[in-house]
């Protein structure tokens, strides 16, 4: 089994049932629905297609809804002579960004961020379209921010605006994000990704909305702002996982800092047993090519060897020409990296060692010493499985739960295959639990009689999450 997981962005190239099925068959573990594009109706169709494809293929695939976040964008531009809503900026010219609602031209554009004049000062850099166009603020007057074009280039409607080094006064969740979050909860999403997280407290409003809606969903923090890197450890502790969003990170931070920042994100996420996704241009050239560059193949493999739980595609599968080929290529690279470079994955240091963490770590040691065929964890929230997974054991991990959303959440956990039950297991005696475990794994073809397995669970009758306190070394078939 491939150990590291694959997250794929769904878009026009793959949103049909056939398109999504091709990604699932190629190896997709988590489907990303990007709420920066499309309507709720569009994404509902994608969600339904995803569930249908997973059912038809018999694979566990999670639905991740990625909230747009407080992204600053240009407004609309007037159409040019070619009928395109695009302008060409030239070096040295003056260009104005205004909070007034106007149609833009080569001299001025509106912006979605009404607080821009209050946050900008003379000398501040402003980047458009991921830094392809660079401006420098010359003055601020009323609703207008006056700039000089430093790096020229084309600008079109709704291109992103970044203010590197500027602490912008934006909320963690916009009105659109709150509406999209409620939609995701009601639709049945398994994972939420929050964009432009800056502080650990950014998760608070999301939790308030979830409580109002009656269901908590794991929230992954996208690390892309300098403030997020400054507050990284507290963010990792507060959120359920993180995504290293290297695109905006490379615009907001000096480019040369991104590789080491990525490694630090992976290390901290593993330390606190939180799944970590490495994203942005992992196999970027495959948007237009059936093969990646050598550098991209190395980037993908090195993310896994650094200890990431998953790598992610963006444009490659959303609008690319070879989406299924991209996923199968990523799967091959990932599989080879873990099969032949397993001992290169760093050992963990300074573990966050709760009682559950200590039990999980002991289970990994036992499985290794006994050459066990499996580590089995019964779980309600997925926490125990993540604590086993962070140690990157060579032994296969099987998470067993009767919670459907936890079942899908475990699709993101390194080295883990999960089983969904339709019955409760908390009140089973030790013997009954072992017989029950044998049947699940034998029916799935994972073990045979005589194999040793290590089983993690809570005490009989214990229903509280986070109470894993028992390790059983069991020989399959011994309790029959």
Model regions: which residues?
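Non-catalytic helical/linker scaffolds that mediate oligomerization, partner binding
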Residues: 1-480
């Amino acid at each position: 089994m491939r150990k590291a997981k694959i997250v794929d962005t769904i878009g026009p190239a793959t949103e049909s049932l056939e398109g999504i099925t091709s990604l699932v068959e190629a190896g997709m573990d988590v489907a990303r629905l990007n709420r920066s594009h499309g309507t709720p109706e569009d994404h509902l169709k994608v969600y339904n297609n995803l569930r249908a494809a997973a059912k038809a293929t018999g694979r566990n695939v999670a639905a991740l809804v990625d909230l747009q976040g407080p992204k600053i964008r240009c407004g609309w531009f007037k159409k040019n002579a070619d009928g395109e809503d695009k302008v060409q900026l030239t070096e040295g010219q003056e260009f104005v960004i205004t909070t007034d609602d106007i149609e833009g031209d080569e001299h001025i554009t509106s912006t979605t961020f009404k607080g821009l004049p209050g946050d900008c000062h003379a000398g501040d850099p402003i980047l458009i379209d991921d830094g392809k166009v660079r401006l420098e603020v010359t003055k601020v007057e009323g609703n207008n921010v006056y700039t000089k074009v430093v790096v020229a280039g084309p600008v079109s409607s709704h291109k992103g605006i970044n203010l590197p080094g500027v602490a912008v006064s934006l909320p963690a969740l916009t009105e659109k994000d709150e509406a999209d979050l409620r939609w995701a909860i009601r639709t049945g999403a398994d994972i939420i990704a929050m964009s432009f997280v800056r502080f650990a407290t950014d998760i608070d409003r999301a939790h308030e909305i979830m409580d109002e809606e009656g269901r908590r969903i794991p929230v992954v923090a996208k690390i892309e702002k300098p403030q997020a890197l400054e507050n990284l450890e507290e963010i990792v502790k507060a959120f359920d996982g993180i995504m290293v969003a290297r695109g905006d990170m490379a615009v907001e931070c000096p480019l040369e800092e991104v590789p080491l920042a990525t490694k630090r994100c992976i290390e901290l996420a593993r330390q606190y047993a939180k799944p970590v996704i490495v994203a942005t241009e992992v196999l970027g050239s495959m948007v237009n090519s059936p093969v990646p560059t050598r550098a991209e193949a190395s980037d993908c493999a090195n993310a896994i060897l650094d200890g990431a739980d998953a790598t992610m595609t963006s444009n490659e599968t959303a609008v690319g020409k070879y989406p299924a080929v991209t996923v199968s290529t990523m799967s091959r690279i990932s599989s080879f990296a873990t099969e032949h470079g397993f001992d290169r994955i760093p050992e963990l240091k300074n573990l966050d060692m709760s009682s559950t963490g200590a039990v999980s770590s002991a289970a990994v040691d036992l499985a290794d010493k006994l050459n066990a065929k499996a580590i089995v964890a019964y779980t309600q929230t997925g926490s125990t499985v993540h604590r086993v997974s962070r140690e990157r054991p060579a032994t296969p991990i099987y998470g067993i739960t009767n919670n459907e959303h936890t079942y899908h959440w475990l699709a993101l956990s390194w080295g883990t295959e999960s089983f969904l039950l339709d019955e409760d297991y908390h009140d089973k005696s030790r013997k009954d639990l072992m017989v029950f475990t044998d049947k699940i794994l034998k029916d799935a073809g994972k073990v045979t009689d005589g194999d040793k397995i290590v089983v993690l669970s809570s005490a009989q009758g214990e229903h509280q999450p986070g109470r894993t306190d028992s390790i059983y070394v069991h020989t399959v078939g011994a309790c029959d």
